[in-house]
Design a protein with these regions (language model features):
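Conserved catalytic region of serine esterases and O-acyltransferases that act on ester linkages
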Residues: 219-222, 226-299
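Short hydrophobic segments within beta-strands
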Residues: 34-36, 67, 156
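N-terminal module-boundary/linker segments of secreted carbohydrate-active enzymes
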Residues: 19-57, 269, 274, 278-281, ...
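Sec-dependent N-terminal signal peptides
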Residues: 3-12
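Alpha-helical cap/lid subdomain in secreted, periplasmic
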Residues: 102-228, 237, 243
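Conserved SGNH/GDSL esterase-like catalytic core that processes O-acyl groups on lipids
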Residues: 42-132
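Residue-level detector of functionally pivotal "anchor" positions at catalytic/ligand-binding pockets or at interdomain
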Residues: 294-320
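C-terminal tail/sorting-segment detector
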Residues: 331-345
Length: 345
């Protein structure tokens, strides 16, 4: 996992949309956004600079950075702050570049950030006790150290994993447990700005855009293309739209957003045919961060054909030869052939 994280750290600076060589302190008039977390922060913010540019924000008028560490929890970041440690990985995602020196968390927060985004480590995201007292401590710390008294503190509700991941939470039940935890802790702490990334992804998993790895590229991290773009849209609509006054959902995706091709590993491309489905999943999550769309919200052409023309169904047996009414999770015998049926979510 640490090796994978280091690879992510290496790749993301190569993908930034920033002003190369421009190093200075941030300006008050900029849109300045800081994520504090881990590789999920990188996934969420990867396409955010592109969206800002698409919405007419000049590259020298915004700044997006991620302070990240592999698997870092709220507890980890609180200790980094308390002990005055230098941030190991500070990634420029796009826009103005910060001064190139070692930063402590307190020093970083003295820059005029408009928004600071917090999150819990994925493996602890549904464990209420892991948030206490660290989320409250982090919120108080951001408010105390921030150069802007009106800084917005947002919390990213992260996504559940595919079942191949070493640790959960997994699938729909995992998403639900994350939601219940975030609802309770955000009420306790008084956080009202929630980025519903996990709900966006779970909505997409109920459509024909779902993939064999549940819209991840490795069971954990978001698939390039559709998944990263959808979560970036949720980030933009939650924390950037109040600053720009423009919705990214009012116009089709740019050619740059559609540039990734499916022949690259882990890519689910954005197309003229699927972007409206992506937008609707984002809109639904923005309207109801703790609820999912109906599985029938986006009937596929294939399902419409099946409904219009009933067909003869082959008998289904389990591996012990028992006749089944429906396919069960696991190995089924259909038409004399072994067929693996995954657990549905």
């Amino acid at each position: 996992m640490r090796l994978l994280f280091l690879l992510l750290i290496f790749l993301f600076p190569c993908l930034n949309y920033g002003q190369e060589g421009q190093t200075r302190n941030l300006q008050e008039k900029h849109f300045n956004i800081l994520f504090i977390g881990n590789s999920y922060s990188l996934d969420a913010s990867a396409d955010l600079p592109r969206l800002l540019v698409d919405m007419g924000v000049a590259e020298n008028e915004y700044c997006v950075y991620c302070a990240v560490q592999a698997g870092a929890s709220l507890d980890y970041w609180w200790k980094v702050y308390q002990q005055g440690e230098e941030i190991e990985n500070l990634c420029q995602m796009g826009g103005t570049k910060l001064a190139d020196h070692a930063w402590t968390l307190a020093e970083l927060l003295h820059e005029p950030w408009d928004v600071v985004v917090l999150q819990q480590a994925s493996a602890q995201s549904n464990q209420l006790k892991s948030y206490r007292p660290y989320l409250q401590n982090m919120v108080d710390m951001v408010r105390r150290e921030s150069a802007k008294p009106d800084v917005t503190i947002a919390f990213q509700l992260t996504w559940s994993k595919y079942f191949s991941a070493d640790k959960g939470p997994y699938g729909t039940n995992g998403w639900r447990s994350i939601v219940e935890t975030v609802q309770q802790i955000s009420d306790e702490v008084g956080l009202t700005t929630i980025i519903p990334s996990g709900t966006v992804i779970q909505n997409l998993r109920r459509t024909d855009l779902n993939s064999s790895l549940y819209l991840t590229r490795d069971g954990v991290h978001l698939a390039y293309g559709v998944a990263q773009y959808a979560v970036a849209l949720a980030c933009y609509e939650t924390i950037c739209r109040p600053l720009t006054g423009k919705s990214a959902l009012d116009a089709p995706p740019s050619d740059a957003a559609k540039a990734l091709q499916p022949d690259h590993k882990g890519v689910i491309p954005i197309t003229d045919d699927n972007y409206k489905m992506i937008y609707e999943c984002v809109r639904a999550a923005m309207a109801n961060p703790y609820e999912l769309i109906s599985p029938d919200a986006f009937p596929s052409p294939q399902s419409a054909q099946r409904n219009a023309a009933p067909r003869q169904r082959s008998p289904i047996y389990d591996i012990h030869g028992r006749l089944l009414r429906y396919r069960a999770p696991g190995i089924n015998i259909v038409g004399g052939k072994k067929v693996f049926t995954p657990l549905r979510h």
